[in-house]
């Protein structure tokens, strides 16, 4: 599994509802690997927005192929949101190497 993470700040005077309306994709791509996307606001700083996308059943080698399909949609989305948020301070894709339930004993 891969995880895409993005951190940015809502601009002064912009609330999350306004951002979300502009952020929603204007086109759905069948087979988009980002099947679960979580957006969260920092509880201590509600202008700090963190977005995580879970990308299941994907290999890092697949990134160029699906980015080629998604780029036109993402470019349009960027044009809609760029005046609402700062440039990302984090924008990366990570490969999951462990998954743990910290409410249970963990065995090596």
Question: What does each model-found stretch correspond to?
Answer:
Residues 9-20:
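Short, surface-exposed ligand-recognition loops at beta-strand->loop->(often short) alpha-helix junctions
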Residues 40-46:
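A short beta-turn/loop motif at secondary-structure boundaries
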Residues 12-13, 46-47, 56-61:
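Short, charged/polar surface micro-motifs in flexible loops or helix N-caps
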Residues 24-38, 54-92, 107:
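An amphipathic, aromatic/His-enriched active-site/gating alpha helix that lines ligand/cofactor pockets
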Residues 93-108:
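Acidic/histidine-enriched, glycine/proline-rich intrinsically disordered or flexible terminal extensions
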Residues 36, 47-50:
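Short, surface-exposed coil-to-beta transition loops
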Residues 1-9, 50-52:
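Active-site-flanking beta-strand signature of metal-NTP-handling nucleotidyl enzymes
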